[in-house]
Amino acid sequence: MLLFVGLGNPTPDSENNRHNVGFKIIDSINKKFGLSKQKPKFKGLLTTGNVGDQKVYAIKPLTFMNNSGICIRELIEYFKIDAEDVIVFHDDLDVEFGKIKAKFGGSSAGHNGIASIDKFIGKDYSRVRIGIGKPKENIEVGDFVLQNFEEEELAGIEKISNHINESISI
């Protein structure tokens, strides 16, 4: 059993924010693997299905980014999912735009969504860091991550989503 988590903020005006790239990845996984219709459960939008013969859950927390851990803990406790079977997709300023880095455990590196998950389930889970790059002009990081992607960046996010979908093997 696996749990895919996409981090983001649940407001309609946040849909194309850099901070919401995790939600975009979950939407792509849901579509690619024909997971169930999203249902509001465990303080998130939950889908279920199978990838190969493996049971999969995918969730977009509705608790806002900085409280994502609450949603994840409820879900893993209910379905008895080990933290080691959780894969979190999230934005990362320290990774060049269009690049992906995966890691298991470690620090939150200042990402409040990851810090929240660490607080509620520990650090023994996988993270897929999706590069959004750093701001090109003098802009606060908090403002940058809440800006919408440019059109050409959205095309890059689609390529990243396709690459992740092709890489999912259980």
What residue ranges belong to the model's regions?
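A hydrophobic, small-residue-rich beta->alpha segment in the mid-to-C-terminal subdomain
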Residues: 151-152
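Phosphate- and other anionic-substrate recognition elements at nucleic-acid/protein interfaces
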Residues: 108
